Amino acid sequence: MAGNDEFVVTPYEVKGRIDYERLREQFGTQPVTPELLAKVHHIAGGDLPPALARGIYYSHRDLPALLDGFANGKPFFLYSGRGPSGPLHTSHLLQFSLCQWFQKRLGVPMYIQITDDEKFWSSKSGLSRDETVQWGLENLTDILALGFDPKRTFTFFDSRSIAAMYPLAVRIARKIPYSTVKAVFGFEPSMNIGLVFYTALQTVPAFWPSWAEGRSIPCLIPCGIDQDPHFRVSRDIAEGMGFPKPALLHSQMVPGLLGDSVMSTTGDRADNALFLNDPPETVDRKVRNAFTGGRATVEEQRRLGANPEICSVWALWRTQFAETNAKFSEITEGCRSGRLLCGECKSQVLERIHRFYRSHAAARAQAAEWAESTILTSAPRPL
């Protein structure tokens, strides 16, 4: 990187300290404003989920138009996905929790993509096909355990759903020149051809309901801002294929427990994230050792307060574990004022994390009974 203000954000690499407003301007997206949040609240009702209310989701493409259409009787569906390279960590759940909230509030269908093929092609650690498939099933079960409706939730498990996806994928692939994929993703000559074709596969769920039903059905994709380039390609070809452009809702990257500006990828620096298969003692150790914004001494922190904005424990509260905005404000102000010391803050968040792990384990056992029934295996139209 050329300087301290340099950062890189692509679907395959995130590094540096990200200037999110600068990134949003570079990508040409719109900010999530208080007026837009009020529109979401008006249409969906109920309290906004933490990640939306507290600014983690900060950027969008065409969300107001999609919401206006829904308010006027035009249905839409949700789409999000997971590349199964290992166990999920808690920050992976942000986009799926938001999708579950939209599904519960609005009764819309949810399409999940498990990209076991892409992780096999892109794995730097040499994941085998068996490993990506097995992790895909494990990840899918964790996702469904968040409370998705079995009757309104469908899964594209790429290697097992290829018969359902391929008729549309070949049509999409014909519309995307190699020069576009190379320019958007920076593919080097050594890149395998699987990843070149993957852009077509990742676009399939965004168009599939419209193609399957023969009518225009808009799509909302909550995703990390790093995934925007994939879906810019999808949006560029949508109207030419007779489909609506997918709307996007972008989140910031969640900081890691060790003080990194972004969360580590699965399998990299295991202490940087809380994995859903971590035993309780491991969760305790990771949180107790997490980077904070505290001062050098208790006396200094009581006098000057701490800095929550750089604290990885505060990020846990902000993203998931402060159930109410009142609790989040209490934690934030206690930290800044020096009333709440880091040890007590960690104890409080650990109580909530362990409670979540227990409830998630019970929900996961139930979801395992129906997870495979969500996988789509046949196309609604012939090749």
Placement of each model-derived feature along the sequence:
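Short acidic, glycine/proline-rich loop/turn micro-motifs
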Residues: 122-126
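N-terminal catalytic cores of NTP/NDP-binding nucleotidyl/phosphoryl-transfer enzymes
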Residues: 46-119, 221-225
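Short, conserved secondary-structure transition motifs
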Residues: 120, 159-165, 253-261
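Catalytic-loop motifs flanking and including active-site residues across diverse enzymes
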Residues: 95, 196-199, 230, 283, ...
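Core alpha/beta catalytic barrel or barrel-like domain that forms the active/cofactor pocket
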Residues: 109-117, 121, 154-158, 201-202
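Short helix-capping/linker segments at secondary-structure and domain boundaries
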Residues: 107, 208-219, 321-330
